[in-house]
Amino acid sequence: SRYLKEKGVASMMWNWDSVEATQWLDRDIIWQMCGMPKNTQAEITAGRRMVNSVSFPYYLDLPYGWFNLRATYENTPEIPHIDAASAKNLLGLEAPLWTEYVPNMKKADYCTYPRLGAIAEIAWTAPENRSWAHFQQKLEDYYRLLSVYGVEHPATLKQAMPGALRAKGYSLWFNRRHLHWAGLHNLIDDAKVKKSVAKQQR
């Protein structure tokens, strides 16, 4: 991180719950928070900058059957308890699009929009000033704006707000990716990591 700092480049690291040995980490390293380690509050108060990557409803690649548009919009991101002076160190929210199973831009558009608009409003608007009903009223203009900027295949509101049966279908189709050896291997690795983290936290 010192080398990058000398070159004028900020370094960022993905931080899961198990990363507690912060005495070895330069405070200039930005944390991408996935999980909330016990030392989060102390670190951000001491000046470490962070990006909130905690909330699964903001993962753009997850199916609308898991988190529909309203569930994403009404989710309140988890943040550490910090004072107003330290709030500047919270740089924003992450809305990742993992592309292992996103074969083309049509699929990327479908996964990302209109969900990204909901996440942007969450990041920029205080909870008391957010309204799902008001957000819905703005969607028509939002779709027009997407078209102007070349987004050709956003999810329709019906696709982004599936009924129970359609939501189940979306989830089943998404989960089919685990029905091969590589997918099963990933599940096994995930279970091992969770077990290791739980053991360290005892």
Please name every model-derived segment.
Residues 23-26, 61-69, 105-109:
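Histidine/acidic-residue-rich catalytic or RNA/ligand-binding cores of hydrolases
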Residues 16-19, 34-36, 55-57, 96-100:
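Active-site beta-loop-alpha junctions enriched in small/polar residues
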Residues 1-30, 34-48:
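Active-site neighborhood of glycoside hydrolase catalytic domains
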Residues 3-15, 50-54, 126-132, 154-155:
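Acidic/polar loop patches that form or flank catalytic/metal-binding clefts of enzymes
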Residues 39-97:
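Aromatic-lined glycan-binding groove of carbohydrate-active enzymes
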